[in-house]
């Protein structure tokens, strides 16, 4: 299936290592202050699936209301190989998407991204688009809590990357490095440890963001 931006340019699925094919989308402060927590059964799930499962838990428990934002696309070509199934063959982005998730927690507006990297020692800034960064800036100026849940897939490590740290490296990338050192994320971000319910207890990190905002 081919997706196009509003200007007609075809979407490059390989440009951003964090984003799988949209076909699939359509169909050092440890929170527990323990650097060696056991990782529970996270194999086989994408970061997005893990966050969605965690959001469902938070919603069912009346803790927070957080949802994945829908992808703004216009479908232009559909095949019907079977009566019971339709296959999207071509679609256009109606507009540039912003961030992956938003919601409300303890009266605070949350707006955040979910990103994965196979890098071991740093997180590449190419995982972000300029409009996503500017969207987070705008939300934060209005008092929103903005961040990115970062997963280092080779080590199964999760962190909350505060928006301010992202902004710092984003603004300096033309003069300096084009990635955020993992050591910096460990020092100034918040480590998340897998649990059972919720799978990713990221609101514990959000509590620390709120406390330090």
From Swiss-Prot:
Q: Which CDD domains match?
A: RecU-like (cd22354)
Q: Does the keyword Transcription regulation belong to this entry? A: no
Q: What is its EC number?
A: 3.1.21.10
* A cellular component annotation (GO) from this entry: cytoplasm
Q: Which Gene3D superfamilies match?
A: 3.40.1350.10
UniProt family annotation: Belongs to the RecU family.
Function noted in UniProt = Endonuclease that resolves Holliday junction intermediates in genetic recombination. Cleaves mobile four-strand junctions by introducing symmetrical nicks in paired strands. Promotes annealing of linear ssDNA with homologous dsDNA. Required for DNA repair, homologous recombination and chromosome segregation.
Q: What is this protein called?
A: Holliday junction resolvase RecU
UniProt gene name: recU
């Amino acid at each position: 299936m081919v997706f196009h931006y509003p200007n007609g340019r075809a979407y490059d699925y390989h440009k951003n290592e964090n984003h799988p094919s949209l076909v699939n989308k359509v169909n050092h402060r440890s929170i527990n202050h323990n650097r060696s927590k056991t990782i529970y059964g996270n194999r086989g799930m994408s970061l997005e699936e893990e966050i969605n499962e965690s959001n469902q838990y938070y919603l069912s428990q009346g803790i927070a209301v957080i949802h994945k934002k829908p992808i703004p696309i216009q479908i232009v070509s559909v095949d019907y190989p079977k009566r019971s199934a339709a296959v999207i063959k071509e679609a256009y982005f109606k507009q540039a998407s912003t961030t992956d998730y938003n919601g409300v927690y303890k009266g605070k507006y949350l707006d955040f991204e979910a990103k994965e990297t196979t890098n071991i020692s740093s997180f590449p800034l190419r995982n972000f688009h300029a409009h996503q960064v500017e969207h987070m800036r705008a939300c934060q100026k209005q008092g929103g809590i903005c961040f990115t849940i970062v997963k280092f897939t080779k080590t199964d490590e999760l962190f909350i990357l505060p928006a301010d740290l992202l902004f710092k490296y984003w603004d300096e990338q033309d003069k300096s490095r084009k990635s955020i050192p993992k050591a910096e994320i460990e020092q100034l971000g918040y480590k998340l440890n897998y649990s059972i319910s919720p799978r990713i207890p990221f609101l514990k990190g959000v509590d620390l963001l709120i406390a330090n905002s």
